[in-house]
Amino acid sequence: MKDNPIINDIAEKIAEKCSPEKIILISYKTNNYSELTSFKLALIVSDDVESMPELECSLYMDIDSDIPFDLVFYTVSEWNSLKDSEGTFAWKIKNTGAVLYG
């Protein structure tokens, strides 16, 4: 699913808007016809982001998609402290996700 044009288009738009360090595809769902129905992305962003809620809101408002998607945010320092801790969601993302950007 890493090569899905809809997912890649959203990842590209996110990269243009906020220049994250990394975008990782966490998961996706398809219907009985193997058509994409939703997906979830992790964004690893700079520690300098002033307001994570504002960034999240602006991305959801500015990026239009016919397919529902969710975003999970980590600052670089949060990501670095959690990605190697087995059992954390960051560890799971690192080990099972697909890097789309960065």
Per-range role (PLM):
Residues 1-22, 30-36, 46-102:
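Catalytic core of pol beta-like nucleotidyltransferases
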Residues 27:
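A short acidic/basic microdomain associated with nuclease active sites
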Residues 39:
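Short glycine-rich, basic-tinged beta-strand/loop micro-motifs
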